[in-house]
Amino acid sequence: QPENAARELAGSVNVRIALFLLVHMPLAYAMEAFWPLATAHAVLVLLAGIRWAWLGRTRQVLYCLSYIAGFEVLWRMTEARVFWEYGKYALALVVLMALFAEWRRSDARLRTVLPVILLAAMVPAVALAVLQFSPAEAFDQLSFNLSAYLALGAAALYCWERPVDRPTAANLLLALMAPIVGILFLASFSTITQIGVDTFATASSWIRSGDFGANQVSNVLSLGALAGVILLIILPRAQGARLLIGALTVAMVIQGILTFSRGGLYSLILAGLAFGLNLLTTPGARGRFLLLIAVFVALVFGVIYPWLNDLSTGAVTARFEDLDTTGRLELARADLMAFQDSPVLGAGVGGSMPYHIYVFGEDVGTHTEYTRLLAEHGLFGILIMALMGWMLLRRYLGNAPGLGRAISAAMAIWTLSVMAHSATRIVVIPFALVLAFLAWRLDEEREPASLAGDNGLPAPTTAVAPTRVR
């Protein structure tokens, strides 16, 4: 009897989800304390992804891509000894291996040529960068500005119209959310342990971002919260897991506010609205979403906001009432000057920097991806933006009304809004865009019986690589 009870407990969906999410708190702490663990983790996750790609395990490849995207900032925070853009190249490498293995085993062909055209449109600006800079400087500029597009193009080729059912969707979002739970833990731990040092100045906070860049942490927390909201709608019957996910989602919103980096919260609100509006035609999901919104609004405005504002002696209100763009408008104006000077081919990748120095007084990279595309790619930048818009529209309309379109719209709006204030600094930005390209097959009338079985939510030791490194 005890053995059967233990086996039943171990097989519980609630327990498996809770263990998978919560194990990333001590894992993040250990990685921060011991950088070789962070490095080994980054390498082993990539190796696991390559292995799954080579074996043609499509679902595991998708989970690994999601996990890499969620973990990139945590690897940076814990000082894993991998290069800065490792997450983007790791994601691209796994995808390219998966495509090669898929084509090797069958007569499969490209589902769409649009990502190829998008990447080809960047060639003129790449050529200009190679001609203008030394080889080392050209590589740095190309890697910093375009590695996200390499990841986007490769992942779009793999994920375009690829069907995702409800259990796979749940796993995919859990794989994305789990490492962000680790980021949440480090940021919260830093906030609590340094509360006497923190002055709550009305500027983005390094301390309340886990001693890391507030912009990146805020954006990742907002995507983790968005994943949590979607999971609360699509997870059936797992009440205990949904309570935990709800608590983690609220915690991510709170910590996102405390970073004082406003962009992530704004993007979350916009994406949440897009998600909710697309559920209005789906009775079951609509009811759950409206209940979720009612509870969330009551918590935020009745409890969380007054508490945070009192804790910060009014700094929260002052920060979010401040309309200063912290130099983004000046950088965007510099980009537009570069576009006016070179409207056809653009200034080349990295070619907008002299304009930034002229207008802003510092050698600062742009935070608005759309103006960077104009400045450095010229008319080809307009083509790139048009292609991204067309791809998103096609896949949005290709998904069925209801949950499918809701997820596609939420991911698209989150990405497009983040690109307006944070460019493509982190790999979750192109990855979230790629999630909008999937064919979400979330049948409202069918409860997935496999969710608690072998084809459902995987145990932490088999879903993704992280729990193999402890």
Positions of predicted regions on the chain:
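N-terminal signal-anchor transmembrane segment
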Residues: N4-R104, V123-L131, W414-V418, I429
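Membrane-interface helix-loop-helix junctions at transmembrane boundaries of multi-pass membrane enzymes
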Residues: W52-V61, E102-L114, L231-A247, T282-L290, ...
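Aromatic-anchored transmembrane helix interface
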Residues: F83-M97, T112-L128, P135-E161, L174-F185, ...
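Alpha-helical transmembrane segments of multi-pass inner-membrane proteins
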Residues: V126, L150-Y158, T168-T202, D211-T281, ...
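A membrane-periplasm/extracellular boundary helix in multi-pass inner-membrane enzymes
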Residues: L186-Q194, I254, L258-T259, G276-F320, ...
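Transmembrane alpha-helices of multi-pass inner-membrane enzymes
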Residues: A227, A406-S417, A423-R470
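Long extracytoplasmic/lumenal interhelical loops at the membrane interface
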Residues: W307-H377, Y396-N399, L403
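Hydrophobic transmembrane alpha-helices and their immediate junctions
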Residues: E376-V418, P448
